[in-house]
């Protein structure tokens, strides 16, 4: 690769970025720009500092049932929760949940319970229309920790203090 950003052994149209088409595909560009910024804001995704003060593990795997990592032939989704001590607010924890529905139809998903004083806020839902994928500013709170994920979609939720 010699320092370039191309996919391994794919120096062809599969891995080329045609920046002249950025305006045509502005929604995709804005989505990935948002996700890169999101990753930089939440250090627990890439830089675990150990268990959260609430004793949740740094990374936990979930099926459509929270805290269950049992997978069967008909399991349709996977959830990953990151938990850790906040570097921004001393004494507080951060929680980030990624859910991926690989099935073609809707799947009911239960997110993990959070410590007292936290609730899940939906930041991203790719099952929505393109203009409604990024939800951070819309205050979509999952009070009952459940969401009906659209087929072949991804959600990102953040545990926030209330």
Regions found by a protein language model. Give the residues of each.
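Carbohydrate-interacting/catalytic domains
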Residues: 1-162
């Amino acid at each position: 690769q010699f320092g370039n950003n191309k996919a391994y052994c794919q120096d062809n149209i599969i891995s080329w970025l045609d920046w002249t088409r950025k305006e045509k595909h502005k929604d995709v560009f804005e989505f990935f720009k948002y996700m890169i910024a999101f990753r930089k804001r939440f250090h627990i995704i890439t830089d675990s500092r150990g268990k959260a003060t609430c004793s949740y593990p740094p990374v936990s795997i979930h099926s459509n049932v929270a805290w269950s990592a049992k997978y069967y032939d008909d399991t349709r989704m996977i959830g990953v929760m990151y938990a850790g001590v906040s570097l921004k607010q001393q004494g507080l924890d951060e929680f980030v949940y990624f859910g991926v529905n690989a099935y073609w139809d809707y799947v009911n998903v239960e997110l993990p319970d959070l410590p007292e004083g936290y609730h899940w806020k939906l930041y991203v839902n790719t099952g929505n229309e393109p203009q409604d994928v990024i939800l951070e500013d819309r205050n979509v709170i999952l009070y009952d920790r459940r969401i009906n994920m659209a087929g072949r979609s991804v959600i990102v939720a953040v545990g926030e203090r209330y």
